[in-house]
C-alpha cells in the first residue's frame, strides 16, 4: 500500500509525563482524496503510567515539528542572504517547510518540482493564494537546484533525485524525506562532496537516512 506506521516514545527525566506517538504515512492517499500523514499522541503519567490525554492531531503536530526542524537547520546553516528556495515534493511537507522557512529567511521566490506535474501545478495554484511570494513550477529537479540557494527535499523517494554534479557553491540542502532505510533522495556522492554534512543524529542517519546509503556505497566511513 506504499505506506508505513511508526511508534515513538519520549521522556525527559524529571517531567511528570511522557509521550508515545503513533504516526503513519501512506503516500498514495492523495489519490484517494486523503492526507498522506495521520496519527495521534498519547500522554501518560510518569509515576503511574496512567493515561492523561489523547491528542488526536491526525499527524499535524508531527508535520509542524518536521517543518520547524527544517527551518532551524536553514536558519543556522544557510546563507542569511538567501532569497530563493527550491522544493522537491508537492505534499503537505512541501507547504509546511516553505511556510516555516519564511519565518527565518526573506524568501522572494520558491521553485517547486515533483514527479507528478499535475500535483505540482495544483500545489503552486493553491499556495499562491496563501503566501505572498513568487511560486514557480519547474520542469526538472536539475532546474530547481540551478535556480535555488536553499533546497528542501521532502519526498518518500527510494531512489536519488538530486545528483552530485548539480551541487554549486553556497547551496544549502535540507534533506527531510529519508527517514527509513530504503528511502534515498540524494545521490550518495553528495555526502562525500559537500563541504559540511550535519545530521540531526549521526547514529540514526547512518542506519536510516542519507548517510546510510553513502556508507553502503563505500564513499564515507
Language-model segments: residues:
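Short acidic low-complexity segments
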Residues: 131-148, 164-165
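Short helix-loop-beta connector
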Residues: 77-84, 106, 168-169
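Rossmann-fold NAD(P)-binding glycine/threonine-rich loop
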Residues: 167-169, 176-221
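N-terminal Rossmann-fold NAD(P) dinucleotide-binding loop
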Residues: 94-95
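N-terminal ligand-binding/catalytic initiation module
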Residues: 1-62, 69-71, 78-81
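Glycine-rich Rossmann-fold phosphate-binding loop(s) that bind the pyrophosphate
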Residues: 90-91
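Rossmann-fold NAD(P) dinucleotide-binding segment
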Residues: 147-150, 157-172, 188
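NAD(P)-binding Rossmann-fold cofactor-contacting core
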Residues: 103-130
Amino acid at each position: 500500500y506504499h505506506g508505513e506506521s511508526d511508534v515513538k516514545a519520549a521522556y525527559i527525566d524529571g517531567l511528570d509525563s511522557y509521550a508515545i506517538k503513533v504516526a503513519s504515512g501512506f503516500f498514495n492517499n492523495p489519490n484517494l482524496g486523503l492526507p498522506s500523514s495521520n496519527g495521534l499522541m498519547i500522554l501518560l503519567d510518569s509515576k503511574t503510567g496512567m493515561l492523561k490525554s489523547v491528542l488526536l492531531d491526525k499527524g499535524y503536530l508531527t508535520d509542524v515539528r518536521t517543518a520547524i526542524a527544517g527551518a532551524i537547520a536553514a536558519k543556522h546553516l544557510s546563507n542569511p542572504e538567501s532569497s530563493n528556495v527550491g522544493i522537491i515534493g508537492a505534499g503537505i511537507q512541501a507547504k509546511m517547510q516553505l511556510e516555516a522557512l519564511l519565518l527565518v529567511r526573506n524568501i522572494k521566490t520558491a521553485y517547486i518540482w515533483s514527479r507528478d506535474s499535475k500535483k505540482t501545478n495544483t500545489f503552486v495554484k493553491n499556495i499562491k493564494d496563501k503566501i505572498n511570494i513568487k511560486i514557480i513550477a519547474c520542469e526538472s529537479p536539475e532546474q530547481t537546484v540551478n535556480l535555488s540557494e536553499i533546497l528542501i527535499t521532502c519526498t518518500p523517494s527510494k531512489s536519488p533525485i538530486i545528483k552530485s554534479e548539480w551541487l554549486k557553491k553556497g547551496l544549502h540542502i535540507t534533506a527531510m524525506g529519508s527517514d527509513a532505510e530504503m528511502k534515498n533522495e540524494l545521490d550518495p556522492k553528495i555526502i562525500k562532496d559537500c563541504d559540511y554534512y550535519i545530521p540531526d543524529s549521526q547514529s540514526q542517519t547512518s542506519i536510516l537516512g542519507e548517510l546510510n546509503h553513502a556508507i553502503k556505497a563505500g564513499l564515507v566511513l
